[in-house]
Amino acid sequence: MRTLNIGILAHVDAGKTSLTERLLFDHGAVDRLGSVDAGDTRTVDGGIERRRGITIRSAVAAFTVGDTRVNLIDTPGHSDFVAEVERALEVLDGAVLLLSAVEGVQARTRVLMRALRRLRLPTIVFVNKIDRAGARTDGLLGDVRRLLTPHVAPLTEVADAGTPRARVTRRPPDGRTAEALAEVDTEVLAALVDGPEPTGEDVARALAARTADGSFHPLYHGSALGGQGVAELVEGLLGLIPAATPGTSGGTSGGTEPRGTVFAVRPGPAGERTAYLRLYGGEVHPRRRLTFLRRESDGRTTEVSGRVTRLDVVGGDATLTAGNIAALTVPGGLRVGDRLGGPTDRAPQFAPPTLQTLVRARHPEQAAPLRSALLALADQDPLLHARPAASGATALLLYGEVQMEVLAATLAEDFGIEAEFTPGRVRFLERPAGTDEAAEEMPWLDRTRYFATIGLRVEPGPRGSGGAFGYETELGALPRAFHQAVEETVHDTLRTGLTGAAVTDYRVTLIRSGFSSPLSTAADFRGLTPLVLRRALARAGTVLHEPYQAFEAEVPADTLAAVTALLASLGADFTGTTGGDPAWIVTGELPARRVREAELRLPGLTHGEAVWSSRPCEDRPLKAGNSGPGTGVGGHSGE
């Protein structure tokens, strides 16, 4: 049986969960339609999700059509849960991008489409809610071509749009489809220019090929609630998006080592962690011993090994084969992002979170349970980067205020803990400015000091590398426990740099070492390492960087001058201005700490008509005269 892993992506309230419920019901996977409003949907499994009517964690459900099993992954629509979307993108064979026929193309939709196009992930556009008052079809197609992708063609037509009588009919690939395909398919272009004109079969083959390579996007219409157009959408999924098979997933079931990625973690009924694994090659069966690679927040790669004690393959198979998804349990627990058989080739499409907050228990007796709960939540979302901070608090990284509210509710409902969050602050980072070193010799006569010899060199590492530790001394020159003490302390110490911000993209090398067998302990090395490291770091110097966000603002033509003046005053660097009457699109990059102000002031300048979207991009050195950590703008100092 073939397997098709499909992600459903959209702006909040475009109908993702409703479409999932419709697909499951129409193909016999559930015996009744769930409702987001009623709180009885299949894929929305948390109390917070049910009350808010939004998806927070990617959920998996499956149905079967003929010889194809379709695994549906219902992803979050809110921008504060962008990390969940990124993990889902890694495991997909294709995607359905939903639009509301009433609200049309929204800011979040454009961000998602950019990510899908960068990945060249096969994507079908589905215009939902055609039976709602105010629904548009022809005008919306123009917006899709202008704002999402010019390479799109409708394969359905709608009659009586905007009324309960709305209905959908198929529109076979024709000359208009061929003209749209000609922009991305040279054979179709040659046939249109030189003849003979392509037949319907020729156009259909080209449509399938260009959809499969992610360069073209078929568009369907329908209503998830009413069911109109859903059969046509399924027909498009099966016919236009290549399904995973053992051959296309990177291995067969006959002896190749398994390769896959953990994209979600959920707590089990007995407190165990259940991991969701997409397998790209090989096979996994119960009791098999697996070794996962884990990238720690400080840049190190560690191994997690264990036997599979529980394996539930989506669809009910006994063995997990290439292309499929399963929930499994391994003693010791897995984290989101753990890789089986090495990393995948796909790079992250979204930057890490840039807001930092401190979390404390409202009641002192809950301080220890709060730390344990936050560590458990960090296993589900490693980008939280939970770590100890000053005064018994825990520091977290977040994307926005909604994520903070959800975390507070999760702690209260799932763990019984009342937590208090400080207002989110932009997280600054330090990077080494140069290379330098420091050393401290073992004091043979002074027993009040550390019985250890340590020399360290600090230098810049490649951008995006995090942190690395190496040796120029012989590994046998120190006991293993002393080596481990130095390495762990280096990474712990650099969580706070010279200005109070965390240090990143560094390489620290142990260049000198020594110990006294009867006197030295690992504690001596843990105590001396921070002193030597901070001396070397101060000599090398650091450069403070602040996060930036790439923005896109669509504004009425008569407000362009006022908008650009505002953005310039907030420190924006412009990368482009396109369009004309009636609207202009302004793009650029803006310090993350000024984004909220831009969002609040734009509506007043544009009669409420501005469409704004932004996403984290590469950070930059902090400009002279701007405030950094510890000043009320940057991260928390002294952590």
UniProtKB/Swiss-Prot annotation:
Q: Does the keyword Methyltransferase apply?
A: no
Q: Which UniProt keywords apply?
A: Antibiotic resistance, GTP-binding, Nucleotide-binding, Protein biosynthesis
Q: Name one GO cellular component term.
A: cytoplasm
Q: From which residue to which does the signal peptide run?
A: none
- Disordered: annotated segments: 247-267, 611-639
MF GO annotations? GTP binding; GTPase activity; translation elongation factor activity
Name the Gene3D superfamilies for this protein.
Answer: 3.30.230.10, Elongation Factor G (Translational Gtpase), domain 3, P-loop containing nucleotide triphosphate hydrolases, Translation factors
User: Quick one: which residues bind GTP?
Assistant: 10-17, 74-78, 128-131
Q: Where is the composition biased (Gly residues)?
A: 627-639
Q: Supply one GO BP term.
A: response to antibiotic
PROSITE patterns named in the record? G_TR_2
Q: Which SUPFAM superfamilies match?
A: EF-G C-terminal domain-like (SSF54980), P-loop containing nucleoside triphosphate hydrolases (SSF52540), Ribosomal protein S5 domain 2-like (SSF54211), Translation proteins (SSF50447)
Sorted alphabetically, which InterPro entries does this protein's record hold?
Answer: EFG_III/V (IPR035647), EFG_V-like (IPR000640), P-loop_NTPase (IPR027417), Ribosomal_Su5_D2-typ_SF (IPR020568), Ribsml_uS5_D2-typ_fold_subgr (IPR014721), Small_GTP-bd (IPR005225), T_Tr_GTP-bd_dom (IPR000795), Tet_C (IPR035650)
Does this entry carry the keyword Transmembrane?
no
Domain tr-type G stretches: 1-247
What family, per the record?
Answer: Belongs to the TRAFAC class translation factor GTPase superfamily. Classic translation factor GTPase family. TetM/TetO subfamily.
The record, for NCBIfam families, names: 47473_otr, small_GTP, tet_protect
The UniProt function text for this chain reads:
Abolishes the inhibitory effect of tetracyclin on protein synthesis by a non-covalent modification of the ribosomes.
Q: What is this protein called?
A: Tetracycline resistance protein TetM
Q: Which organism is it from?
A: Streptomyces lividans
